[in-house]
């Protein structure tokens, strides 16, 4: 990686603004439902604290302003509390990993937990060194930052409560920059957005470096894209071909050895071949594109593998009509919702002997049981291939959820925190949040 990282600079005693990605699902009870992104940022947070920095954490959560506008237009209630990072703050305070973190050479241990709670269990009650700001800019926040001591952490409130964040507004970026001496981007999941906290802020903070998670993401994805160990197999799923065209074309151009396509996007390919797809999701405007993709794959010597069977339901009786049939025998009243057992076996065999695997996107309607079976089967196949020597990279919400649901997270080489960012990077696009960082 040709970007400077937090390890390349001296941060002791400095105010370090770390852009993290804490855009995590929060349940109605206020508990974090998936802490993957939070845990991904912990090495950088811990490193900064141990080096004696005054740590400022900033993140977005959802799209509060857009959702507020929609609620007002529909005359619906708007709950501002669901967009607060307060729940993340409570979660951070109780993390065992952030206990007993001491600054280098200090006499007193710096501790980041003080009360029990959250889904991770109980944390020992100790001195509280993690704080929460009720805002992300302004005089009150400035005062809180000035009170920070070395090794202490301040989590700012949701950046997207201000329109200037998504607009990459210079004034908002300047206000964020005034809080710090050093900028660290550790939010790979937001690196494809040119927002005030991912790009604009670097106009005002000249020291702008990558965090440890950002470094890890870029190293894994760069190797997969530019110098993969072969055979190289990519698995793509999800609803729409249109969302994946750039990454498909990039993978074919780089001559991925095998390209496995599942999920609803497969039906656009089936219809382009003349198959009847019933009421399955199809992008009719993408039919010619699907044909062109198949031609390009063939010309490049890329083995493009589509499902051979799928789980379907009758659109008129979805609760009682599930069955598995060959894809070419789909009549007009059926809806395809997952890959079948035969396809799962074919995909598993396609991964045998692979040395590099990239997977993004579910194989079916993962959020509805039993149509998560195909995605879980692929997760198991990827984990098995990893145990047999493959480097595996999994990105995208449903793909990562499948890995976690199956208890396979420890068996995957790298679980990417990026969804759209991962896809754009694999498409060969330079991400704004990465481009803004200092070169080595």
Question: Which residues are covered by each model-predicted region?
Answer:
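Active-site loop-to-helix "anion-binding N-cap" substructures in soluble metabolic enzymes
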Residues: 1-440
């Amino acid at each position: 990686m040709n970007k400077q990282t937090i390890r390349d600079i001296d941060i002791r005693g400095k105010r370090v603004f770390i852009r993290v990605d804490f855009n995590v699902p929060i349940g109605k009870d206020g508990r974090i439902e998936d802490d993957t992104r939070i845990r991904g940022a912990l090495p950088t947070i811990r490193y900064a604290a141990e080096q004696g920095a005054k740590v400022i954490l900033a993140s977005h959560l959802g799209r509060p302003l857009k959702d507020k506008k929609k609620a007002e237009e529909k005359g619906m209630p708007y709950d501002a509390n669901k967009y607060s990072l307060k729940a993340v703050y409570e979660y951070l305070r109780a993390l065992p990993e952030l206990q007993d973190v001491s600054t280098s050479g200090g006499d007193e241990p710096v501790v980041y937990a003080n009360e029990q709670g959250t889904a991770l269990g109980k944390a020992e009650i100790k001195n509280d060194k993690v704080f929460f700001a009720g805002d992300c800019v302004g005089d009150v926040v400035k005062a809180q930052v000035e009170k920070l001591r070395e090794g202490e952490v301040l989590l700012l409130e949701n950046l997207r409560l201000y329109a200037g964040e998504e607009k990459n507004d210079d004034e908002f970026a300047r206000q964020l920059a005034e809080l710090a001496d050093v900028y660290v981007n550790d939010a790979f999941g937001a690196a494809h957005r040119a927002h005030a906290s991912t790009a604009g802020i670097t106009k005002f903070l000249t020291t702008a470096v990558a965090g440890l998670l950002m470094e890890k993401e870029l190293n894994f994805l760069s190797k997969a894209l530019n110098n993969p160990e072969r055979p190289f197999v990519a698995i793509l799923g999800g609803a729409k071909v249109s969302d994946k065209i750039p990454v498909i074309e990039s993978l074919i151009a780089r001559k991925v050895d095998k390209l496995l396509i599942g999920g609803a996007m497969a039906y656009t390919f089936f219809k382009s071949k003349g198959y009847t797809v019933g009421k399955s999701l199809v992008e009719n405007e993408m039919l010619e594109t699907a044909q062109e993709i198949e031609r390009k794959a063939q010309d490049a010597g890329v083995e493009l593998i589509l499902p051979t069977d799928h789980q379907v339901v009758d659109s008129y009786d979805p609760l009682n009509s599930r069955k598995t049939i060959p894809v070419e025998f789909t009549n007009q009243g059926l809806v395809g919702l997952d890959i079948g057992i035969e396809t799962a076996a074919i995909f598993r065999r396609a991964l045998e002997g692979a040395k590099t695997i990239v997977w993004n996107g579910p194989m079916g309607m993962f959020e509805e049981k039993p149509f998560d079976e195909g995605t879980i089967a692929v997760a198991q196949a990827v984990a098995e291939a990893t145990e047999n020597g493959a480097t595996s990279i999994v990105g995208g919400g449903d793909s990562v959820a499948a890995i976690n649901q199956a208890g396979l997270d420890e068996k995957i080489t790298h679980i990417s925190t990026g969804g759209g960012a991962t896809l754009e990077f694999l498409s060969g696009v330079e991400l704004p949040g990465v481009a803004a960082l200092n070169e080595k």
